[in-house]
C-alpha cells in the first residue's frame, strides 16, 4: 500500500480540481497512482453530473473576451447566485470566453470539443466543475463577432457580469463603441433596425400596447380624465409613404381648423410630424437599437446621434443570464430546504 502523503494529495488536487477528501479517497482507491486517481475522479464526476442533469441552472455569469478582430460573449449557468460568485466558476467562465474567441467554433457542439487550458475539452471541464462545485454547471450559448481593422469593438459587462455586450461600430472610436454597449446593456434592444422585426411580432406588440392603454383609460375614467386614443401603428415598417402623406394632410387640416395662417405651417408641420413618428414607432423604440433614445444624449435617438458623429453600428450581441430559462419552482434552494426539513423530521 503506497503512502498517501500531503504532497501527493496536493498534486492531485492541482491536476483535478477535486476537494481534499475526494482527492485522498481517490488516491487510496488507486494505491497512490495519480493518473488512475484522475481517471477515477473523472468517472465519479461524470456520475455526479449525470445526477444533476435534470436540475434547472438559471443563475450564472456572462463572459466577454476580445482577441484582436474577434470577440466572444458567452453565458454559463449555475443553479445559485452564490456559486456564480465562486472563484472557480468565474475562472471557468473567463476561460470559456477566451477559448471560444480563439477557436471560433460554428456551434455549441464544436465549442464543447474545444481544448481548455487544463487540457480537457470544454465539455469535460463542465463535467468536472459540476462534480467539484456541487451544482449543475452548464455552458449555455455564445456569440462570435468579427470586425475589420478600421472598426471598433465595444465590450461591456454590467451587474457583476449578469449582462454581457459586444458591439461593433464603424467610425468613432473605442470609447464611443463602449458607450453604445452600455446603452445596449441598459435598454435591452434585441435587433439593430426595424427592418429586422417580424410583421406578426409588431402586430402582437401593438395589440399589447393598446391593451395597456385600455387599462389606463379605465383608471382615467374614474377620475374624469379623457380617454387616450389607441395607437394605429407600432413600427416604421408600417408607416408607408401613403400613411405618412395622410398624416401630413391631417395635420394641415387640423391647423386650418385652428385658424393658423398657412404662412407659418412650414414651421409647425415638421415638429408635429416628428411627434407622429415618435407616437407610432413604440415597438421600434422598445426593441430596435437605432430607434431608442440614446442614454448618453436623450435629445437624440441612437441613430441620430451616430449620424451626428459620422458613425454607425454594424452589429451587436447582448446576453443576460437566465433570459428565456423557465426556472423550476423546486429549485436548488428549495431542494436544500426540503432535505434539511426531512432530516430534522427524522431526528
From Swiss-Prot:
PROSITE patterns: EF_TS_1, EF_TS_2. It is found in: Cytoplasm. CDD domains: UBA_EF-Ts (cd14275). InterPro entries: EF-Ts_dimer_sf, Transl_elong_EFTs/EF1B, Transl_elong_EFTs/EF1B_dimer, Transl_elong_Ts_CS, UBA-like_sf. Pfam families: EF_TS. Residues 80-83 are annotated as: Involved in Mg(2+) ion dislocation from EF-Tu. The keyword Membrane does not apply. Keywords: Cytoplasm, Elongation factor, Protein biosynthesis. One of its GO terms (cellular component) is cytoplasm. GO terms for molecular function: translation elongation factor activity. It comes from the Bacteria. The keyword S-adenosyl-L-methionine does not apply. Belongs to the EF-Ts family. Associates with the EF-Tu.GDP complex and induces the exchange of GDP to GTP. It remains bound to the aminoacyl-tRNA.EF-Tu.GTP complex up to the GTP hydrolysis stage on the ribosome. This is Elongation factor Ts. The lineage of its organism: Bacteria, Bacillati, Bacillota, Bacilli, Lactobacillales.
Amino acid at each position: 500500500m503506497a503512502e498517501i502523503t500531503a504532497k501527493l494529495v496536493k498534486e492531485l488536487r492541482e491536476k483535478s480540481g477535486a476537494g481534499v477528501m475526494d482527492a485522498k479517497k481517490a488516491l487510496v482507491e488507486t494505491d497512490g497512482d495519480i493518473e488512475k486517481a484522475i481517471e477515477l475522479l473523472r468517472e465519479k464526476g461524470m456520475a455526479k453530473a449525470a445526477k444533476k442533469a435534470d436540475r434547472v441552472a438559471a443563475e450564472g455569469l456572462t463572459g466577454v473576451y476580445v482577441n484582436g478582430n474577434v470577440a466572444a460573449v458567452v453565458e454559463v449557468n449555475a443553479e445559485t447566485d452564490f456559486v456564480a460568485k465562486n472563484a472557480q466558476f468565474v475562472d471557468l467562465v473567463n476561460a470559456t470566453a477566451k477559448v471560444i474567441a480563439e477557436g471560433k467554433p460554428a456551434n455549441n457542439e464544436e465549442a464543447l470539443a474545444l481544448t481548455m487550458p487544463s487540457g480537457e475539452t470544454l465539455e469535460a471541464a463542465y463535467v468536472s466543475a459540476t462534480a467539484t462545485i456541487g451544482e449543475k454547471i452548464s455552458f449555455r450559448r455564445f456569440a462570435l463577432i468579427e470586425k475589420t481593422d478600421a472598426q471598433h469593438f465595444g465590450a461591456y459587462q454590467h451587474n457583476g457580469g449578469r449582462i454581457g455586450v459586444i458591439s461593433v461600430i464603424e467610425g468613432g472610436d473605442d470609447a464611443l463603441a463602449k458607450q453604445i454597449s452600455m446603452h445596449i446593456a441598459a435598454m435591452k434592444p434585441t435587433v439593430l433596425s426595424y427592418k429586422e422585426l417580424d410583421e406578426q411580432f409588431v402586430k402582437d406588440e401593438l395589440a399589447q400596447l393598446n391593451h395597456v392603454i385600455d387599462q389606463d383609460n379605465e383608471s382615467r375614467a374614474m377620475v374624469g380624465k379623457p380617454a387616450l386614443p389607441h395607437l394605429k401603428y407600432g413600427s416604421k415598417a408600417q408607416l408607408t409613404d401613403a400613411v405618412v402623406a395622410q398624416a401630413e394632410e391631417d395635420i394641415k387640416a387640423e391647423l386650418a381648423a385652428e385658424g393658423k395662417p398657412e404662412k407659418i405651417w412650414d414651421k409647425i408641420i415638421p415638429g408635429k410630424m416628428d411627434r407622429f413618428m415618435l407616437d407610432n414607432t413604440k415597438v421600434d423604440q422598445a426593441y430596435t437599437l437605432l430607434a431608442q433614445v440614446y442614454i448618453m444624449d436623450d435629445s437624440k435617438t441612437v441613430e441620430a446621434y451616430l449620424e451626428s458623429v459620422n458613425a454607425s453600428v454594424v452589429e451587436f450581441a447582448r446576453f443576460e443570464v437566465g433570459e428565456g430559462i423557465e426556472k423550476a419552482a423546486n429549485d436548488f434552494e428549495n431542494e436544500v430546504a426540503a432535505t434539511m426539513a426531512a432530516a430534522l423530521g427524522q431526528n
